[in-house]
Amino acid sequence: MGSQAYRGRFAPSPTGPLHAGSLVAALASWLDARAHQGQWLVRIEDVDTPRCLPGTGPAILQQLAACGLFPDAPPVCQSRRGALYQQALDRLVATGWAYPCGCTRQDIARALAASGQARQRHGELVYPGTCRQGLNGRPARAWRLRVDKNEQKSAFAQAVQALIAIDFIANSSTGLMETEVTWQDRLLGRQHQNVSRDVGDFVLRRADGLWAYQLAVVVDDAAQGITHVVRGADLADNTARQILLQRALGLPTPQYLHTPLVLGANGEKLSKQNGAQALDTSRPLAALNQAAAVLGLPPQTGDTADALAAWVNAWKDTACRPHAPLS
């Protein structure tokens, strides 16, 4: 992909200020865009409004600016883009990809237990497809994507890019078709996930009326013309679902690069939820040097602008960064 076509983004959730871990993703996405002579956008992912803190979006932009990271277009907020998400859901419903679900978490747990499939992944129950054939008189609570709509295999085959494959395989135990997605991550290499087994039909619109992260991200990446996604490795698990949604909506798939995580003293990922300290922007170069070290980039002295310029050059050199050559 040519450098002029490149468009990347940093998409933080305003659940708290940036910390050392989120700066790694911000710096990596900015460097990748600059190394490609492309555009770098910022999107505030505030679709999960109950978790968002007032005033945090502007505070994040101020933190980025203090570190010399300025977007090439005005930032957008997901909370103002509900009409786009509704259009996407309407399309998925019309094409048979989405269906209403009346299940509560208790319903899902009971259905899994009754079938001997008490499956749980990352604290979430793997949906067994209870409402695929209808609500049986119950009111709709949420909307889900049917991940094994295998009659679309020919359409997938026509649309799939190089390094991406979507296969429909028969489960030898159940005889049911399952969907496995394979893609190439620029750092992690070949990745694959059986979405049917590991996730099940996932939520597009929640029971509380809020839009699900997966749908919002896919719609926004396409609407903003994002060609390359550079984000933390904790989000790699979302990629297969997002590729499925892109295919179902007929949208392009960006290239993906998932960066190393910053771990806390307890060995867990540094995050706002486990009390990560807000980024100290009074010493931006020190904060940037810490982030650069995680990315395998050499330390810099002097001012922030010179340091960023040096890291852009180093980013282009495969000996100085952990991922594959620019593509």
From Swiss-Prot:
Q: Which residues bind ATP?
A: K272
InterPro entries this protein is in? Glu-Q_tRNA(Asp)_Synthase, Glu/Gln-tRNA-synth, Glu/Gln-tRNA-synth_Ib_cat-dom, GluQ/Sye, Rossmann-like_a/b/a_fold
Q: What is its EC number?
A: 6.1.1.-
GO molecular function ontology, one term from the record:
ATP binding
Q: What does the entry list under GO cellular component?
A: cytosol
**Where's the motif 'HIGH' region?**
12-22
Record-listed L-glutamate binding positions: R9, F10, A11, P12, S13, E45, Y213, R231
Going by the record, the broad EC class of this enzyme is ligase
Protein name as catalogued: Glutamyl-Q tRNA(Asp) synthetase
Instruction: State the organism of origin.
Output: Polaromonas naphthalenivorans (strain CJ2)
